[in-house]
């Protein structure tokens, strides 16, 4: 598995990975990811972590190699440098709240200059000998370059999982640099999709549009659940207020949709409280996003 963030059941990517791969033999699964933070799941024990702090060190220290392999079953959990993790989180919070193009390009440049293509990564790949590389499709270009490198080194089959739409470039507006960035992203995603042996989408509409755009077969992959027992849902009639709960990321414009829902609820509640929108996210939203989503008398 190749992911950008650590395999953590509390984030959306990690939760999806656990849903897909729980029940598999942990000895047959490894995860390469691009953060310093520790993983948190019961599925995978073999990891290779490349942090951006490591990349910076590798640029200024000639013999420093970015990235480290570890076995989470045998690793001393106290060896995780909490200070580095906190610094990293502050950095990513900044990028999430200020996702301007120049900052994104600065990160891409860091991955271009950092020495992550090294003997440590090669040894990890040689020791594990993957048959299949499963990777969610990310907006960042460096994750695709990392994928291509792993693919070339291992000759493993690639399965690419498309969730968010990174192919659309027209009609989205934005600055000149934003439009250039979207075109670069779309071209990179298309290249990865064409190199992949199998492409999955998350909806019939995305499957149809991606198949036409890329001229390649797309399949649909949903998260699983146990439907052997029909759940019983009961409405709490002791109170009139109906709560709508959203749990997940507010990035990629989702805060705008939540804002539209909050405004609709605010109108409905004008004469009497009927609905309440509760929003839970692992990420701190920008001030603009928070002002849009959180409305008095609605959310």
Predicted regions and their residues:
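Membrane-proximal helix-turn-helix segments that form the acceptor-binding/catalytic region
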Residues: 116-123, 145-153, 166, 179-198
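Active-site proximal beta-strand in glycosyltransferases
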Residues: 132, 136, 148-169
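Conserved catalytic-core segment of nucleotide-activated headgroup transferases in glycan assembly
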Residues: 226-297
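Carbohydrate-associated surface elements
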Residues: 205, 223-224
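Conserved nucleotide-sugar donor-binding subdomain of glycosyltransferases
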Residues: 71-132
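A short, active-site helix/loop in glycosyltransferases that binds the activated sugar's phosphate group
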Residues: 35-36, 191-218
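N-terminal subdomain of nucleotide-sugar transferases
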Residues: 1-78, 218, 226, 263-271
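Short N-terminal targeting/anchoring amphipathic segment
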Residues: 121-143, 157-159
């Amino acid at each position: 598995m190749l992911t950008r963030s650590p395999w953590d059941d509390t984030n959306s990517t990690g939760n999806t990975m656990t849903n897909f791969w729980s029940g598999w033999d942990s000895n047959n699964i490894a995860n390469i990811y691009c953060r310093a933070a520790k993983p948190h799941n019961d599925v995978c024990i073999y990891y290779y972590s490349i942090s951006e702090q490591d990349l910076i060190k590798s640029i200024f220290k000639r013999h420093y190699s970015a990235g480290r392999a570890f076995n989470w079953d045998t690793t001393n959990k106290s060896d995780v440098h909490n200070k580095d993790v906190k610094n990293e989180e502050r950095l990513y919070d900044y990028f999430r709240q200020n996702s301007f193009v120049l900052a994104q390009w600065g990160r891409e440049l860091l991955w271009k200059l950092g020495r992550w293509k090294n003997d440590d990564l090669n040894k990890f790949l040689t020791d594990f000998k993957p048959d299949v590389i499963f990777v969610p499709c990310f907006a960042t270009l460096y994750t695709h370059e990392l994928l291509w490198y792993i693919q070339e080194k291992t000759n493993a089959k690639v399965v690419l999982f498309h969730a968010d739409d990174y192919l659309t470039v027209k009609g989205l507006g934005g600055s000149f640099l934003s439009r250039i960035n979207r075109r670069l992203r779309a071209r990179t995603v298309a290249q990865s999709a064409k190199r992949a042996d199998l492409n999955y989408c998350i909806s019939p509409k995305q499957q149809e549009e991606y198949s036409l755009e890329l001229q390649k077969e797309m399949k649909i992959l949903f998260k699983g659940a146990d439907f052997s027992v029909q759940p019983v849902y009961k409405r709490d009639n002791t109170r009139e207020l109906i709560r709508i709960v959203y749990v997940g990321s507010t990035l990629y414009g989702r805060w705008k949709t939540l804002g539209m829902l909050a405004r609709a609820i605010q109108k409905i509640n004008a004469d009497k409280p009927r609905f309440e929108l509760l929003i839970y996210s692992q990420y701190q939203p920008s001030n603009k996003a928070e002002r849009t989503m959180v409305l008095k008398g609605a959310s």
